[in-house]
Amino acid sequence: MKLKKKFLEKSKKIAEERIDVLMNLAEKESKAGKIDRSKNYVLLGKKIAMRMRMPYPKEWKRRICKNCGSFLIYGKNARVRTKAKNYPHVVITCLECNSITRIPIKSEKK
């Protein structure tokens, strides 16, 4: 059992590194204007995470459109706004498919 656990930990670490490399490549290609290639890198990263049954890293998860799968670069193909109507939140709008993602802002406790 110990051997299997060590193998799983090692393979998950390798998967995290690969996802990180793929997302960095997706960001680079997105900035260069090659959107199809960046979508491909995002899809590969998601497949690796699903195969290893691990959650997608939060810092990358928020940079991907849930509807069309494109890598979001704020100001280029995504719009970011803060709203405080009912509850304070950040609204990220994908400018390719017009889907909206809302992320709540937690208020500081005094």
Swiss-Prot record:
GO terms for molecular function: ribonuclease P activity; zinc ion binding. Its main location: cytoplasm. Its cofactor is Zn(2+). Zn(2+) binds at C65, C68, C94, C97. InterPro entries: RNP4, Rpr2/Snm1/Rpp21. It comes from the Archaea. Binds 1 zinc ion per subunit. Its EC number is 3.1.26.5. The keyword Nuclease applies. One of its GO terms (cellular component) is cytoplasm. It is found in: Cytoplasm. GO terms for biological process: tRNA 5'-leader removal. Keywords: Cytoplasm, Endonuclease, Hydrolase, Metal-binding, Nuclease, tRNA processing, Zinc. The keyword Transferase does not apply. It catalyses: Endonucleolytic cleavage of RNA, removing 5'-extranucleotides from tRNA precursor. Consists of a catalytic RNA component and at least 4-5 protein subunits. Belongs to the eukaryotic/archaeal RNase P protein component 4 family. Part of ribonuclease P, a protein complex that generates mature tRNA molecules by cleaving their 5'-ends. This is Ribonuclease P protein component 4.
